Curated annotation (Swiss-Prot):
Taxonomic source organism: Conus litteratus (Lettered cone)
Taxonomy of the source species: Eukaryota, Metazoa, Spiralia, Lophotrochozoa, Mollusca
Keyword Secreted among UniProt keywords: yes
Signal peptide start and end residues: 1-20
UniProt remark on domains: The cysteine framework is XVI (C-C-CC).
Protein name: Conotoxin Lt16a
Length: 83
């Protein structure tokens, strides 16, 4: 009889706990996906900023108008004005 109790406890309590995903586990995947999209957008802005930096004055004019990510423009402005 004790063997039956142990096996029932394992299959009815421990097995479902090990196989079910909690809400916290599911939301972590969603946030990781959102961060990945943000990284891709930041990469696009950085790439565009570096391409504009090669053209010179066009980059300075556009960056003064505003940028979605100010840190790339401020850093690039600092680099171009120090020359």
């Amino acid at each position: 009889m004790p063997k039956l109790g142990v096996s029932l406890f394992i299959f009815l309590v421990l097995f479902p706990l090990a196989t079910l995903q909690l809400d916290g586990d599911q939301s972590a995947g969603r946030h990781a996906q959102e961060r990945g999209e943000d990284l891709f957008k930041m990469y696009q802005y950085l790439r565009r900023a570096l391409e504009r930096r090669r053209t010179g004055e066009d980059f300075l004019e556009e960056c003064m108008g505003g940028c979605a990510f100010d840190f790339c423009c401020k850093r690039s402005l600092r680099d171009t004005t120090s020359d």
